[in-house]
Amino acid sequence: MTVRILAVCGNGQGSSMIMRMKVDQFLTQSNIDHTVNSCAVGEYKSELSGADIIIASTHIAGEITVTGNKYVVGVRNMLSPADFGPKLLEVIKAHFPQDVK
């Protein structure tokens, strides 16, 4: 199984697209089976079926609600692997250990 990440920002045009690339690079280097997509906060509900983990800035993460086996990771610096990396790995290792190579 592949862990599915959704990067969310306010408009879905800038930050989330860059965050998608940064998260993809980080997870590839960490040997995690994954896919990463991005969208605006107003679109995340329509994208939830294709996501296991939502990653967003802390102020946007507070607006996101999920149920079931889905998780929200709020980060201060969406572009810094030093900030989002440990938080994302913690959720993946706890809930999606089969995706860690």
From Swiss-Prot:
Q: Which residues carry this modification: Phosphocysteine?
A: C9
Gene3D superfamilies given in the database record: 3.40.50.2300
Catalytic center residues: C9
The top EC class is transferase
GO CC terms of this entry: cytoplasm
Does this UniProt record's set of keywords contain Flavoprotein? no
Q: Which GO terms describe its biological process?
A: phosphoenolpyruvate-dependent sugar phosphotransferase system
Q: Where in the cell is it found?
A: Cytoplasm
- Give the keywords, sorted: Cytoplasm, Kinase, Phosphoprotein, Phosphotransferase system, Transferase, Transport
Reactions that this protein is recorded to catalyse? N(pros)-phospho-L-histidyl-[protein] + L-ascorbate(out) = L-ascorbate 6-phosphate(in) + L-histidyl-[protein]
Domain PTS EIIB type-2: start-end pairs? 3-96
- Briefly describe its induction: Induced by L-ascorbate. Repressed by UlaR.
This entry's Enzyme Commission designation comes to 2.7.1.194
A Pfam family cross-referenced in the UniProt record is PTS_IIB
What are the recorded GO MF terms, alphabetically? kinase activity; protein-N(PI)-phosphohistidine-sugar phosphotransferase activity
| Function summary | The phosphoenolpyruvate-dependent sugar phosphotransferase system (sugar PTS), a major carbohydrate active transport system, catalyzes the phosphorylation of incoming sugar substrates concomitantly with their translocation across the cell membrane. The enzyme II UlaABC PTS system is involved in ascorbate transport.
Tell me the domain comment. Answer: The PTS EIIB type-2 domain is phosphorylated by phospho-EIIA on a cysteinyl residue. Then, it transfers the phosphoryl group to the sugar substrate concomitantly with the sugar uptake processed by the PTS EIIC type-2 domain.
Matching entries from NCBIfam families are given as: PRK10222.1
Question: Could you tell me what this protein is called?
Answer: Ascorbate-specific PTS system EIIB component
Q: Lineage in the entry?
A: Bacteria, Pseudomonadati, Pseudomonadota, Gammaproteobacteria, Enterobacterales
